């Protein structure tokens, strides 16, 4: 059974292996052992309530409970921007007009923004290419909503997710090349690495503080504003079906979109409910895929099961109960994995 669980110190080798497969552009998963070890330590301290809210962040891994192999990672930052400033560009409009000359120009413009300060953030979603099957990506992404639903008081009203922008296999970012590089005087990969390893002071020091007309950027850069990396398109679609929307905020490095949603409007959070579990053999049937998660804060587990989403009682085998860290008589959180398609 493949389960989502809290990260542990022993996962460092697995995280390094995953980081080596990202191809760059995933700022929060750098192939740097010291940085990843510090990230694990911060997550463990978050679970033990040893950090202020401004520093808290949860990290989860997707594990095969039989072999112990780790094939994916996902994370939640509790409140961004309360220590280091949280930057986006807001894509807006400036109008230049003259009645005398009969000229009216509405120009797309980038405004430096800290509007998402204090929001909870979904981040560091990466699944090993060999594991991209059997619904693993859905489970990895949406398991965080089960945790947030169970421990709602730990998180803020708005949830954001920065989507990876357009970067080629050589680490070339059209948006960075046309804009960021002119102010930071370094390649995208270098800026990405510095940010991922916590060296963020240079952002505040070198960021352009004034609005930027997008027409001044290359056509290639303009074309990727708000667009995602091809490998990230499925992750974007997953979040949009959960209620997330692009509200014209983009990443300052690669121009990728930032999606956002009020936490209580996220489908999986809103629709999930608690059901009792029993031990036995699950009844056969053609049931839809569902997410199930325990309510154990320190030993959280989530997994994919086939079940009736409307049931009031789930039956699991002894092996499933063990993998989910549950016992008969406990209550688990249940929700349909994907929203039902509306029919006309």
UniProtKB/Swiss-Prot annotation:
Catalytic residues identified in the record: 229 (proton donor)
Enzyme Commission (EC) number: 2.3.1.109
GO molecular function per UniProt: arginine N-succinyltransferase activity
Classification via InterPro entries: Acyl_CoA_acyltransferase, Arg_succinylTrfase_AstA/AruG, Arginine_N-succinylTrfase
Biological processes annotated in GO: arginine catabolic process to glutamate; arginine catabolic process to succinate
Binding-site list for succinyl-CoA: 125
Keywords noted in UniProt: Acyltransferase, Arginine metabolism, Transferase
Phylogenetic lineage: Bacteria, Pseudomonadati, Pseudomonadota, Gammaproteobacteria, Enterobacterales
Biochemical pathway: Amino-acid degradation; L-arginine degradation via AST pathway; L-glutamate and succinate from L-arginine: step 1/5
Domain of life: Bacteria
Xref: Pfam families: AstA (PF04958)
Identification of the protein by name: Arginine N-succinyltransferase
NCBIfam families from the UniProt entry: arg_catab_AOST, arg_catab_AstA, PRK10456.1
Signal peptide: none
Purpose: Catalyzes the transfer of succinyl-CoA to arginine to produce N(2)-succinylarginine.
Enzyme category, top tier: transferase
Family from the record: Belongs to the arginine N-succinyltransferase family.
Catalytic activity: succinyl-CoA + L-arginine = N(2)-succinyl-L-arginine + CoA + H(+)
């Amino acid at each position: 059974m493949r389960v989502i669980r809290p990260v542990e110190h022993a996962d460092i080798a697995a995280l390094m292996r995953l980081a080596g497969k990202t191809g760059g552009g995933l700022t929060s998963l750098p192939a740097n052992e010291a940085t990843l070890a510090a990230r694990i330590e911060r997550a463990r301290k978050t679970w033990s309530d040893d950090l202020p809210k401004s520093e808290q962040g949860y990290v989860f891994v997707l594990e095969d409970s039989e072999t112990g192999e780790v094939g994916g990672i996902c994370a939640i930052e509790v409140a961004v921007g309360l220590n280091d400033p949280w930057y986006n560009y807001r894509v807006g409009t400036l109008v230049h007009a003259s009645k005398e000359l009969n000229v009216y120009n509405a120009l797309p413009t980038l405004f430096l923004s800290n509007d998402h300060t204090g929001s909870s953030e979904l981040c560091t979603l990466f699944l090993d290419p060999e594991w991209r099957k059997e619904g693993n990506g859905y489970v990895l992404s949406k398991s965080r909503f089960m945790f947030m639903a169970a421990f709602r008081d730990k998180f803020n009203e708005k949830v954001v997710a920065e989507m990876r922008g357009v970067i080629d296999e050589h680490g070339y970012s059209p948006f960075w090349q046309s804009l960021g590089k002119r102010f930071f005087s370094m390649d995208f990969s270098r800026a990405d690495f510095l940010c991922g390893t916590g060296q963020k002071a240079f952002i505040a020091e070198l960021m352009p503080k004034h609005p930027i007309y997008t027409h001044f950027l290359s056509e290639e850069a303009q074309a990727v504003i708000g667009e995602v990396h091809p490998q990230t398109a499925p992750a974007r679609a997953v979040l949009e079906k959960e209620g997330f929307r692009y509200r014209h905020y983009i990443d300052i490095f690669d121009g990728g979109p930032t999606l956002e949603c009020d936490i209580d409007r996220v489908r999986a959070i809103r629709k999930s409910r608690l059901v009792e579990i029993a031990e036995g053999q699950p009844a056969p049937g053609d049931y839809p895929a569902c997410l199930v998660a325990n309510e154990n804060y320190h030993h959280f587990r989530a997994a994919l099961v086939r079940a009736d989403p409307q049931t009031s009682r789930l039956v699991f085998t002894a092996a499933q109960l063990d993998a989910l860290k549950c016992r008969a008589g406990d209550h688990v959180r249940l929700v349909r994995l994907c929203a039902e398609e509306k029919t006309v």
